């Protein structure tokens, strides 16, 4: 094989690799909001505690989220990948069940911009 043939073969491979890279642009993974649902039975102090423990919010942030849920019916606690969001929801439900409270939260897929 001559030198000119090798060069064109290499150039051809590089072109193919570049085209494949363009085709395989990865999309960002979906993100999910964890939404706290207000109820009339769970004490506000417990909700603040859960937000601080599960979502690692400051006491101030926890109170703000709790109050938003209380006044608006629901509030976003955070936005995460699906696995992490599911884990957060499970942790909230476990803490609430263990304490005998009906506190609920749910997932909602975040809208793409």
Swiss-Prot record:
Signal peptide: none
The protein's name: ATP-dependent Clp protease adapter protein ClpS
Known function: Involved in the modulation of the specificity of the ClpAP-mediated ATP-dependent protein degradation.
Domain of life of the native organism: Bacteria
Subunit structure: Binds to the N-terminal domain of the chaperone ClpA.
Record family assignment: Belongs to the ClpS family.
GO biological process: protein catabolic process; proteolysis
């Amino acid at each position: 094989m001559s030198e000119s043939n090798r060069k064109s073969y290499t150039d051809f491979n590089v072109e193919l690799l570049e085209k494949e890279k363009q085709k395989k642009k990865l999309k960002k993974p979906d993100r999910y909001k964890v939404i706290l649902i207000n109820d009339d039975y769970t004490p506000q102090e417990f909700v603040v505690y859960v937000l601080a423990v599960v979502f690692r919010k400051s006491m101030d942030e926890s109170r703000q989220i709790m109050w938003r849920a209380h006044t608006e019916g629901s509030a976003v606690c955070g936005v995460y990948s699906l696995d992490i969001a599911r884990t957060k929801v499970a942790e909230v439900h476990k803490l609430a069940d263990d304490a005998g409270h009906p506190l609920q939260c749910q997932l909602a897929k975040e809208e793409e911009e």
